[in-house]
């Protein structure tokens, strides 16, 4: 990847980070909870979104060719277009994204990018650490970036603010274990990949 392209993408992420809204959503107010994940077979991506309306689970999927290479910190270029296509037609009160939100070098991981583009509340849920310090306060392990609490580490998962939520929302969501909508999106995306 050319240096000028990386520089441009970094500027784009900084612009997105300046447009993130941090405000209390209230997990208890969510009626439609969505999760989105993606699996790959070669350069074909299989993005699956799952919505839970409090009673039933619904899902949609999109597949497409992905040409952008995997570059840590720039995952959004590879995954966001298909993820957005998979989730945008659901009426989501909160979208959980497999990936980071503000726990990112430019406070603009894929969950934040998707949240700002769709103008929706998002939380990133990742299986590995990308960026930030883990600071223990009582029984809570906060993820801190540039002095700001942007997420929490619970077990092996990293939850972080994407858009239109605050740290209390992230803490509250993280107490309920790994979200079923994400587990289902992960499972279905892998099943789709195997069928092809």
From Swiss-Prot:
Its main location: cytoplasm. Coiled coil: none annotated. GO terms for cellular component: cytoplasm. Its cofactor is Mg(2+). The record marks 70 as: Interaction with target DNA. It comes from Sulfolobus acidocaldarius (strain ATCC 33909 / DSM 639 / JCM 8929 / NBRC 15157 / NCIMB 11770). This is Endonuclease V. HAMAP family: Endonuclease_5.
């Amino acid at each position: 990847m050319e240096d000028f392209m990386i520089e441009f993408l970094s500027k784009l992420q900084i612009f997105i980070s300046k447009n993130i809204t941090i405000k209390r959503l209230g997990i208890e107010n969510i009626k439609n909870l969505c999760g989105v994940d993606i699996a790959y077979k070669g350069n074909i991506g299989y993005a699956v979104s799952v919505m839970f309306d409090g009673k039933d689970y619904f899902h949609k999927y999109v597949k497409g060719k992905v040409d952008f290479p995997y570059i840590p910190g720039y995952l959004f270029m590879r995954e966001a277009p298909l993820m957005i296509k998979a989730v945008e037609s659901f009426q989501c009160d909160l979208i959980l994204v497999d990936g980071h939100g503000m726990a990112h070098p430019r406070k603009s991981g894929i969950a934040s990018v998707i949240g700002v583009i769709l103008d929706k509340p998002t939380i990133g849920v990742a299986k590995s650490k990308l960026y930030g310090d883990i600071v223990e306060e009582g029984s809570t392990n906060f993820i801190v970036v540039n002095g700001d609490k942007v997420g929490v580490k619970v077990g092996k998962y990293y939850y972080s603010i994407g858009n239109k939520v605050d740290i209390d929302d992230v803490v509250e969501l993280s107490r309920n274990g790994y979200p079923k909508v994400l587990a289902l999106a992960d499972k279905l995306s892998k099943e789709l990949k195997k069928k092809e």
